[in-house]
């Protein structure tokens, strides 16, 4: 149909053929959302199906619209970010404490579980804070570090007339716990920077694919 072909020609650059839906879409609709994923799906479609200029144009438009990939050095990593696989946290914690540590993520509770079968001097002494009522070892402090909280520590300053402890906030204990938690959190960023370029690239690609792939 000549008139249809002429119209498509006239609208070149303003409409694109989407082989996934089998029809033309206006530019604002086609080049929107997760363009990286859309481009990959069209590429996969093209590998399996005969295609021509219109599919190639659509793919190029999506690829050109994709946001510039963020580099490893530009990323601001924080321990406990949910997009980072727990295997990476397990590897860091095992390195930090010099023993096998496993970190798991409980999605329903939005919390982390930390397991360690052998607690050594690093966990029981170096990364440990002894409060008046409770001792927080390295594993307990790692759990706080992962969710960016500090233990709410109290101490007794004597007894009331009924013989119960008069409890006040243990500011010193909290400060010490905070310092150790900061050490754990900052250590993660340093540890990442010491990993291989391949490791860093995989992590950066993961970030870009998850967050840096949208056109609004």
Predicted regions and their residues:
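ASCE P-loop NTPase motor core, strongest for the SF2 helicase catalytic module
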Residues: 209-216
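Charged, low-complexity intrinsically disordered regions
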Residues: 1-205
